[in-house]
Amino acid sequence: MESKFAHIIVFFLLATSFETLMARKEIDGPEVIELLKEFDSNLMCEGKQMWPELIGVPTKLAKEIIEKENPSITNIPILLSGSPITLDYLCDRVRLFDNILGFVVQMPVVT
């Protein structure tokens, strides 16, 4: 019984000695806050970001609709469903995944 109690005490001592990953000290100052704001603003893209209504629509028509609804989208590759993709994020790209019949099978989103 004493062994379990000792383990619990050691666990709590270790847990209280670590800070959480998101914790920020007051001495970090406003510079850290400004950098975080700048980072967040870079992730925001302009215009419409997703088109759930285009699932089942012919791919070429879907491409025209996306170009019309968000002119900042200039890169719209058409890929066969299941194709490998890169994990980078670009505000000017929407990938269209279609099937062998030429219909959109996944929701187009800015990626």
From Swiss-Prot:
Single GO MF annotation: serine-type endopeptidase inhibitor activity
Organism (species): Solanum lycopersicum
Domain of life from the UniProt record: Eukaryota
Protein name, per record: Wound-induced proteinase inhibitor 1
Induction: By wounding.
UniProt family annotation: Belongs to the protease inhibitor I13 (potato type I serine protease inhibitor) family.
Pfam family, one: potato_inhibit
Entries under InterPro entries matching the protein: Prot_inh_pot1, Prot_inh_pot1_sf
